[in-house]
Amino acid sequence: MNSKMSEELKIPKDRVAVLIGEKGSTKRKIQKLTNTKITVSSKEGDVLIEGEDNYRIFVTGNIVRAIGRGFNPNIALKLLKEDYALDMIGINEFSGKSKKQEERIKSRAIGTDGKARRTLEKMTNTNICI
């Protein structure tokens, strides 16, 4: 029995163009690699992912979330590998409600010219987007 499953999510409007790619190339590539259908509302940033396999929809959702949070699509596509995962940590969990504290934490995590972030990525074998 073939039954369609779906997931709806929202990404920032300024990341919609990155998700779609030049002439739709990024979206097509994701759809082909995951065997899903992605529908994007450019005005609102709403994304609908449809398919017949829950796991593929889950992985596609993580790829879309990663792109929406600032990752390059080629890095986000690494999530297709079973030993890769997406983990999002809210800086406000550590900064409280203070915008100054949030900016300070972001600055420390990035470092001068991104050196701290690059060092963290190398030491932990991860990709980090702040």
Annotate the PLM regions:
Residues 1-130:
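RNA-contacting regions in translation and RNA-metabolism proteins
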